[in-house]
Design a protein with these regions (language model features):
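Hydrophobic faces of well-ordered beta-strands that scaffold small-molecule active sites
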Residues: 15-21, 41-43, 69-73, 93-95
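Short, acidic/polar
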Residues: 21-35, 77-84
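Conserved anion-binding
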Residues: 90-132
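Glycine-rich, proline-tolerant flexible connector loops at the mouths of alpha/beta enzymes
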Residues: 28-57
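Alpha-helix-loop-beta-strand connector modules within alpha/beta enzyme cores
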Residues: 52-79, 83-84, 111-118
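Active-site-proximal loop/turn and secondary-structure-junction residues that shape catalytic pockets
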Residues: 23-25, 47, 75-77, 97-99
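N-terminal amphipathic alpha-helix/helix-capping segment at the start of soluble metabolic enzymes
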Residues: 1-20
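Glycine-enriched alpha-helix->loop->beta-strand junction motifs that scaffold or abut catalytic
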Residues: 35-40, 87-92, 112
Length: 132
């Protein structure tokens, strides 16, 4: 598993610095990485046009720059997009527009493995992250 700088900062109670991007252009992440100023990049998919191939390329760019990755997804189809984003290599998923406690429980189930211990619904997918 790739190092997750954002998770490391959170676990050690340290501040982190990230930036938001609304473009699926991976070269933008390269520019952000070359500044050396950020721990993570958040792709705001809720407001940005993208295709599923773009998710793979955005994650490749963050990995090459040593950045953590986060994706903010819209309320629907949140489970599908969360599974595809994790499969592409995103390390964090930010769910937008939850309205009820059950909405947020479903969000957590969407990103947890489908095992008796974890209680999630995220199955094994043959995606980019599974063959790395």
């Amino acid at each position: 598993m790739k190092p997750n700088k954002l998770r490391e900062c959170l676990d050690s109670n340290q501040p982190s610095i990230g930036t938001h991007i609304h473009s699926s252009w991976p070269s933008l992440i390269e520019v952000v990485g070359y500044t050396g100023m950020f721990d993570y990049v958040e792709f705001v998919a809720e407001y940005a046009p993208f295709d599923l191939y773009s998710l793979d390329n955005l994650c490749r760019a963050t990995e090459l720059q040593g950045l953590s990755s986060m994706i903010k997804i819209d309320q629907e189809p949140r489970r599908f997009l969360a599974e595809r984003a994790i499969g592409a290599g995103f390390q964090s998923v930010l769910f937008a527009d939850g309205r009820t406690v059950e909405d947020f429980h479903e969000c957590v189930r969407a990103v947890k493995p489908e095992t008796p211990e974890d209680g999630g619904v995220h199955g094994v997918g043959v995606r980019r992250i599974s063959y790395m």
